[in-house]
UniProtKB/Swiss-Prot annotation:
Role this protein plays: Negative regulator of class I heat shock genes (grpE-dnaK-dnaJ and groELS operons). Prevents heat-shock induction of these operons.
Gene: hrcA
Protein name: Heat-inducible transcription repressor HrcA
InterPro entries in the record: GAF-like_dom_sf (IPR029016), HrcA (IPR002571), HrcA_C (IPR021153), WH-like_DNA-bd_sf (IPR036388), WH_DNA-bd_sf (IPR036390), WHTH_transcript_rep_HrcA_IDD (IPR023120)
Protein species of origin: Parasynechococcus marenigrum (strain WH8102)
Pfam families: HrcA
Alphabetical GO biological process terms: negative regulation of DNA-templated transcription
Amino acid sequence: MKPLSARQQQVLQATVHHYVDTMEPVGSRTLVQRFGIPASSATVRSAMGALEKRGLLTQPHTSAGRIPSALGYRCYVDDLLPEPGVAVQHLERELTGLSLRWAALDDLLQQLARRLTDFTGLMSLITRPQQPRAQLEAIRLVQSGDRLLVMLVEDSGRASHLNLRLPPGASDELTAIERWTDQQLEDGSINWRSLPPQLQRSGDVLRSALDHPSMSPETPLVVHGLSRLVAEPEFHSTAELRPLLELIDDQPCAVVSATDQPGVWIGEEHPQKALQACSVVQAPYRCGQEGVGQVALVGPMRMAYATAHAAVQRVARHLDLLLN
């Protein structure tokens, strides 16, 4: 694409700022008056026409002014993003007051997500660092009446347990199913396809225990500010909102991209169709050698990108410092 002239850059930046603030299309006269562009309305109108021809601005109604297109937002983010305001310094001061106790990492992530949402007005997500999966070392089953205590022991030393009701007839199989799982784990993992038919009832109980959420080592991510996202005018349509809520409810980790670089996904750039009416701003953070987590903000394409970009970068950097 041919580079924009200085005047076109100024007009595009002003149009984005106006629309983010007001959600109203804007005309040339308003841009001149509000943003002090040193040119006549006719000159600014000509620049807006050129930007529209290049697909950077669009006119929602024949008699209306212009608003940014997804391509216009992309050009703005890549080339015209201003320095964040002094308000970001206030966020940094808040972050310095948050410290990490290893027993309360989830609490820390919740606090950071809440501060991100309060600061930006956007929905925030923070994923935990993707850590290597622990190897299951042993399964122990303890019966007490019609209850069964299932205990899992990992090679890391971590243990978890679940107390559940034992179905009729399954108690006779417990010794055999425990012996079978020991043999399976000696080979590295459990191959359920090799489960003997006579152990099917106890096997079903054990599989349901292994799949129970309480047996997961940790929450994979925290989400805050969903109500802020739902309240945005862009999502008042049920057709836009339903697939977005379903994605966040069923596959929240799919909202962020697995990357070790900061990024901004605008509209149809996002691989998830449910998010193609949104923008996602994210930055990675690291936890030693254990993996990469993501700090992300989700909102309409009409968002304050400079503030969002600066906020996720600072929270990610704060987590880097705390975890390393």
